[in-house]
Amino acid sequence: MVGRVQPDRKQLPLVLLRLLCLLPTGLPVRSVDFNRGTDNITVRQGDTAILRCVVEDKNSKVAWLNRSGIIFAGHDKWSLDPRVELEKRHALEYSLRIQKVDVYDEGSYTCSVQTQHEPKTSQVYLIVQVPPKISNISSDVTVNEGSNVTLVCMANGRPEPVITWRHLTPLGREFEGEEEYLEILGITREQSGKYECKAANEVSSADVKQVKVTVNYPPTITESKSNEATTGRQASLKCEASAVPAPDFEWYRDDTRINSANGLEIKSTEGQSSLTVTNVTEEHYGNYTCVAANKLGVTNASLVLFSKYAKTEPDSMQVIEFLHIDLKSIRHPLKVNPIQK
């Protein structure tokens, strides 16, 4: 705040004398401002504010005051604040310059002028605007599906920032309002992802921060395909599941767990698993079970590896020859002599 400094005791009589000449008893600190009302000056935090005051003649005695006291009396600076100085572009100007304005500088400032005829005052109200700044936001959170979630986003600024929440999905659904809290009741897996908090006012660009919401849910088999195989060749069964955390996979046959050994190979990545038979034999045909599990649940799917029988070449030739003869007989019917009795 632009304040004042106590004068040296030795100089106190001289200072008091100056003030008595400059600020006569009963001087009103009100908005008569040379026939004008109070001026409002709006400045953004960190910028420089210039409070204008122009006198009628060089002999006028001038002072700047605010709610804290005297800032300048004539050319004598009473304020300790190094940001404050006089600005005189010409002989009749007695403006006040405040550098790096902050919120505590906001308020009423009075330019008091003592002329040869009567005292006058010019009052200026300094308004300090502050860009929006998010001061507190929820940390990333992990919850189970069906839980209630509350996200918090608090911001400072002048004017008061408007808070907007948005779920960062392809649809980009926004939750409009001046609410610092976003409540999600019975959250679903589709509502997981990043949530963006935006604090905005008219001073500058918005301040934006994000919160990541992870929703845990039990596994669900999304794809499982049976497969046909040929004896002596390689064949695979594949199983896919959706879950958070990512599921662990196991393979079974006839209630016996299968491991990667004896010509069988299991490969599992996040969300999918495969069982590969490197050299199919008759004993490999049959039913298999894919099991997907995480800390919230377990599910399974049944798959079948079945035989693919190839047709032999002679059989196909016989069919073709038969069809050829049959068609020929239709085109050229045989002539048969009647039986003699």
Curated annotation (Swiss-Prot):
Pfam families: I-set, Ig_3. It is a lipid-anchor; GPI-anchor. One of its GO terms (biological process) is locomotory exploration behavior. InterPro entries: Ig-like_dom, Ig-like_dom_sf, Ig-like_fold, Ig_I-set, Ig_sub, Ig_sub2, IgLON_domain. Residues 1-28 form the signal peptide. CDD domains: Ig (cd00096). Residues 29-122, 132-214, 219-304 form the Ig-like domain. PANTHER family: IGLON FAMILY OF IMMUNOGLOBULIN SUPERFAMILY-RELATED, LIMBIC SYSTEM-ASSOCIATED MEMBRANE PROTEIN. This is Limbic system-associated membrane protein. The gene is Lsamp.
